[in-house]
Amino acid sequence: MEVPRLDHALNSPTSPCEEVIKNLSLEAIQLCDRDGNKSQDSGIAEMEELPVPHNIKISNITCDSFKISWEMDSKSKDRITHYFIDLNKKENKNSNKFKHKDVPTKLVAKAVPLPMTVRGHWFLSPRTEYTVAVQTASKQVDGDYVVSEWSEIIEFCTADYSKVHLTQLLEKAEVIAGRMLKFSVFYRNQHKEYFDYVREHHGNAMQPSVKDNSGSHGSPISGKLEGIFFSCSTEFNTGKPPQDSPYGRYRFEIAAEKLFNPNTNLYFGDFYCMYTAYHYVILVIAPVGSPGDEFCKQRLPQLNSKDNKFLTCTEEDGVLVYHHAQDVILEVIYTDPVDLSVGTVAEITGHQLMSLSTANAKKDPSCKTCNISVGR
């Protein structure tokens, strides 16, 4: 069921997804109280005879749609002309009211065979918990409705971005990636205490940890993928890593071929900004056949390591050569442990610029450059 945007006319057309909802048309958003009482503005009255939906089932959940079905007693079932669907984010479950400020999450649809598809990126966000309740209604000749009592409240959670959605993000990121610059090392900044802890408690090997919630809210890697964060940006005038960092004054550097080579796969993970002009692209490097590789293969678009707009590894005269995109900041996640002995740790001479940290950074949902037309 496609639901009209708030600024659409009250008599909105049916969804173009006709194979799903060809018999469904949408009415004006109604104003009624959650407890089923008649509202002064709504023209809705109670009627005991209409069946109350029960045994509600939610299925086919995506980041911005779901299917809903329920059972009803046969009594007065043939009098049902409409369904009222009350959809709320879970944190608002105790204030389920038909109010102007909640529109358009209060949905009115003509009665059609179930299950019914509810779709709308302007009110459904990915990876978000919602509550839903249903009411049956019968539209009268004078335009008023008689309604059943509300059903029980059901909870569900929307899904992450699919590969299709991530491919849309990927294509938007490609537009602004810019020309490619040569680089030779990946690096990771941390505090001295971090590297001391790695040496003492992890046998000198940096261990993957769960990615934080920075970036797109719908990214399937946030809070799930385990990896180690690296950078590869270089200064334009020197071709070397910058001396400043927001993450710590000690830097681990490792030759690029140690992490990125023909025995690894490269994946696109996310594209976002933080209310600034800077845009970030998250890439994942995973050794072929590793658990991280299997995780990414199921969820992320895979990139051609030799030919893409962000990070490449090519062979020239028998030597591996590396390039990164100039106009986006790359955040590279490596999914396996990395031993400190294969690189070097040294103190940087620049500043620790905490304001540039992306730890748990929230994506700007209004940016037209890095958002797509699904839940943010």
Curated annotation (Swiss-Prot):
Which InterPro entries does this UniProt record tie to the protein?
FN3_dom (IPR003961), FN3_sf (IPR036116), Ig-like_fold (IPR013783), PHYHIP/PHYHIPL (IPR042868), PHYIP/PHIPL_C (IPR045545)
Q: Which GO terms describe its cellular component?
A: cytoplasm
Keywords annotated in UniProt = Glycoprotein, Phosphoprotein
Report the domain of life of the source organism.
Answer: Eukaryota
Q: Which residues are glycosylated?
A: 23, 37
Every Fibronectin type-III domain range: 52-161
Q: Which residue positions does the secretion signal occupy?
A: none
Modified residues annotated as Phosphoserine in this record:
12, 15, 25
**Could you say which protein family the record assigns here?**
Belongs to the PHYHIP family.
UniProt function note: May play a role in the development of the central system.
Protein name per the record:
Phytanoyl-CoA hydroxylase-interacting protein-like
